[in-house]
Amino acid sequence: MKFFHLSDLHIGKHLFYYSLLEDQKYVFHQILEAAKEEQPDAVLLCGDIYDKTIPSAEAVSLFDWFLTELKETLPKALILIIAGNHDSGERLEFARELLEKEGVFIAGLPPREADEKIRKVTMTDPAGEVCFYLLP
């Protein structure tokens, strides 16, 4: 199996009052090109998706665009997303159940109840099985 691992995207970040959104979109285009060429079986987005717990509308739109393009580029690949300390876990989990039907798994919050378990996602191919435990 082949995986892409991305983290600390910080979508919506500003440096000295300069928005990095255009630069981030350029990087996402590069990632999409690499995904098209390499055809990973899963893409892991591990923490700090956004730069702020309440991201701008433009940052949310850019991430929406990226996920849509990524899924169109890799229709069979799993996309696994966990929140980081810059993210709002509750907001990141928006439409979680709907997205799972499309192979996009999101864990924004750790287990909250004693009987709750860490989210487990399993992939299988001819070589065997891989289990991912989504713990933000």
Outline where the language-model segments fall.
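Residue-level detector of flexible, active-site-proximal loop/helix-junction positions
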Residues: H10, H86, E113
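Metal-dependent catalytic neighborhoods of phosphoester/phosphodiester hydrolases
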Residues: F16, I49-L67, A83-E102, I106-G108, ...
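Glycine-rich loops and low-complexity Gly/Arg-rich segments
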Residues: F28-I31, L67-K71, V104-G108, V130-C131
